[in-house]
């Protein structure tokens, strides 16, 4: 978006100095709890304007991008050593260009996989680690035993490796692709983490020090690819072996995809303000956060249907969540859940106006999305949506009963319900409905398969680690940390370490699920991984979803609003 366009529209952020919460429910004198969420910092006039005033990519840039794409294809086709091929794939993926070169990447990785008999990587820590990570990442199994050559007879990693920072960093990143029970990778992670932490401040190469610091904050396997691409484009520009063709194409492609996303944001913002849900004082008004999450899950332009429907269902879901958490009485919530189970508006007149509005928004939007899927995909997804909504609201209902009854469940009971109440089974099923092969394939998501189970459980636990203090202050349902404290008598610090350990172990299980879930193909496997990565983005350092004026706004603005400067042609 150029400066004239930005001036003609409004600023992306809004000043809430004079903000007054609007209350829809004037027919009830009953005292209601409030979520105490601050109003959205995002200016909805600005967001709606993106439908027209999005970042238009100039024709000369489109032509240049096609030319550069051809040059990169030639790179893939040129003879090169296996390590060079892996490094090309790694850079292309981290720059966010993998959607442009899916075939070339698969062919390159499969050729490296087939070329494994001569052990060309043997004794080379960086090559062994990069090969392991990239091949496992794309579903080609490599055993952990490839790292035995770097261990002593006592199974400890060789201290000589500490001087090989690039190799240590590659080992560190590879270790997060481990499965449960892979002890060599556990040792690799501990070893690499310890010595990278000790060394990074003294690394002479600035680009390498920057990479190490970034990785220690959060490993690549746990990062949102689209956000990582924005960061890596800037970091890559400073690297000593930077390829200018790849860098230029990455900048152009990033802006081209961002333009598509901006247009979608504008159209979705127009829909959102017509629902009236943005005026509810007790609920989060988080359309752009919902879009960021859908973009985390499925940023590729070809997943427009999945992306938009995840935002629509997710935005309504957030308000339904807040209604169960802080607004409705137990009797009202029981009646709401009953109406969802029947999928009927017949008896919602018994509900207060606000809950009627929420129910009708949920009901109508779900049916609209079902109609769109029928039109664009040719099958009926509404029965699958209804099943997911019923399970969602029953999970909310159970949490509300715990709260109103003053009950603190054991951690296991909480977790089994919480992996549904977090909302990701519903959101991922929404994404799956948008990409399924046919209507019969929709049966695969009921009952919940392991892939969805573990990705949703991870999102629940990561969410709890970030939001528990805020939600406890509001008097909401207890979270996993507090369930464990109540069950065992542990301190909060000990409980947090325990939940952190569960998160790490469940990541290993999810990694293995990506190989074992043969009934699902790409891209749904990646959708699940990306949903957890989105949770790390929003909750790793607190509540970056509910608290809109947080560290996340900087990344959201750089990914969704601000194009990358292209400099001189």
From Swiss-Prot:
InterPro entries assigned: Isoprenoid_synthase_dom_sf, Terpene_cyclase-like_1_C, Terpene_cyclase_plant_C1, Terpene_synth_N, Terpene_synth_N_sf, Terpene_synthase-like, Terpene_synthase_metal-bd, Terpenoid_cyclase/PrenylTrfase
GO terms of biological process kind: diterpenoid biosynthetic process
Known cofactor(s): Mg(2+); Mn(2+)
Residues where Mg(2+) 1 binds: 321, 325
Catalytic activity line of the entry: (2E,6E)-farnesyl diphosphate = (1S,5S,6R)-alpha-bergamotene + diphosphate; (2E,6E)-farnesyl diphosphate = (+)-alpha-santalene + diphosphate; (2E,6E)-farnesyl diphosphate = (-)-beta-santalene + diphosphate
UniProt-annotated binding residues for Mg(2+) 3: 463, 467, 471
Binding site for Mg(2+) 2: 321, 325
Keywords: Lyase, Magnesium, Manganese, Metal-binding
Enzyme Commission number(s): 4.2.3.82, 4.2.3.83, 4.2.3.81
Keyword Transmembrane helix in record: no
MF GO annotations: magnesium ion binding; terpene synthase activity
Binding annotation for (2E)-geranyl diphosphate: 284, 321, 325, 460, 463
Parts forming coiled coils: none
Classification via SUPFAM superfamilies: Terpenoid cyclases/Protein prenyltransferases (SSF48239), Terpenoid synthases (SSF48576)
Enzyme class: lyase
Motif DDXXD motif mapped to chain: 321-325
Keyword Zinc-finger: no
Pfam name, any one: Terpene_synth
The protein's role, per its UniProt record: Catalyzes a mixture of sesquiterpenoids from (2E,6E)-farnesyl diphosphate in fragrance biosynthesis. Catalyzes the formation of alpha-santalene, beta-santalene, epi-beta-santalene and exo-alpha-bergamotene, as well as traces of alpha-farnesene and beta-farnesene.
Annotated protein name in UniProt: Santalene synthase
Source organism (scientific name): Santalum spicatum
